[in-house]
Regions:
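Flexible hinge/capping segments at coil-to-helix
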Residues: 28-30, 124-139, 230-233
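Conserved C-terminal helix/tail region of periplasmic/extracytoplasmic solute-binding proteins
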Residues: 298-328
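Short, low-complexity disordered leader/linker segments with a strong preference
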Residues: 1-34, 324-328
């Protein structure tokens, strides 16, 4: 009997030891997680949360670190996602379509903007170009695969201009801006805050934008699919912090403007102009948005900028944002 008791006691001790090891391993695995967040040059609640340190504050509770990477436009986000160097980001409509067609594993987890005026085609104040028709034979700077890229080609198609009749120069914003200012290019297809910056400060003219063309450029929060499957609770936490920043911006607009002007080295008037063009949201990706995205994807396929047809609803998962917003 005593011998049997000793065996049982030993077995129980081993079980408790193994359970403790398993718990310790799981805990250390969580502590080893680093959330990699991408950010662009736009004025987004993502930037506010970064400057406030809210992501670090929230993820620290889980023993999780945060790493930030800045990108010039949407397409480079997906190169980083493909190589596991990015877990979250905020991008426009065209980059997600290109990435889906390329087979990159990402998920649209929320819709954050439904902008129309925030993307357009700029020309210099003294330019003789007054409409899209005048772009024939001209040099136009644009970031390949961006929302502005989509808008440019939609504008050309609407006016019956063959893409071969314009000289499209593919430049990221940090390259396109000096090229535009120096006159090396005749026009620049771009988004805010660059549009507001150049129209207010430099007298540039917008010859067309999403509102005039009836072309929206929605933005999305995205997550690396594998990361989202492995850490759904962190996806929800990410969305809660974004929502916190969005709500805070609405309630503390003057202070938010100061943060944006300081971070981007631009005037308060430019920030206000950007906000007049678009206000941030955090909502599920609706059926209407998916349908608009499908039209854009079909157009991109017809144009030849993506090599295969896609179904845009396949990359949408609203479950995270529905939980995050509901839990407010």
């Amino acid at each position: 009997m005593y011998k049997k008791f000793k065996v049982l006691s030993f077995a129980l001790a081993i079980s408790l030891f193994l359970f403790g090891c398993e718990k310790s391993t799981a805990s250390s695995k969580k502590e080893d997680v680093t959330v990699q967040i991408g950010i662009q040059q736009g004025l987004s609640p993502l930037l506010l949360a970064q400057k406030k340190g809210w992501f670090e504050e929230e993820f620290k509770k889980e023993g999780v670190k945060v790493k930030w990477t800045e990108f010039q436009s949407g397409p480079p986000y997906f190169e980083a996602i493909a190589s596991n160097r990015l877990d979250f980001g905020e991008v426009g409509n065209s980059p997600v379509i290109s990435a889906q067609a390329a087979g990159i594993e990402f998920t649209e987890i929320a819709n954050t903007s439904y902008a129309r005026k925030g993307t357009g085609i700029l020309v210099q104040k003294d330019s003789k170009i007054t409409s899209v028709k005048d772009l024939k034979g001209k040099k136009i700077a644009v970031a390949k695969g961006s929302s502005a890229f989509n808008l440019l080609y939609r504008a050309l198609e609407k006016e019956g201009i063959n893409a071969k009749d314009v000289n499209v120069i593919q430049l990221q914003p940090d390259e396109a801006q000096p090229a535009f200012e120096s006159g090396s290019v005749d026009a620049w297809a771009i988004w805010d805050p660059f549009i507001s910056l150049h129209t207010l400060n430099k007298g540039a003219k917008v010859i067309t934008d999403g509102e005039q063309l009836n072309v929206s450029s929605p933005e999305f929060l995205i997550a690396r699919t594998k990361f989202a499957k492995e850490h759904p609770e962190l996806v929800e936490k990410f969305l809660k912090v974004y929502e916190k920043a969005r709500v805070w911006q609405g309630s503390n607009l003057d202070e938010a403007i100061k943060i944006y002007t300081s971070a981007k080295k631009i005037d308060a008037e430019i920030v206000k102009e950007v906000f007049d063009h678009d206000k941030p949201i955090l909502v599920p990706v609706t059926k209407e948005i998916i349908e608009e995205q499908q039209k854009t994807a079909d157009f991109q396929y017809k144009l030849g900028s993506i090599k295969k047809e896609i179904k845009t609803d396949k990359v949408v998962d609203n479950s995270f944002v529905e939980k995050a917003v509901k839990a407010k």
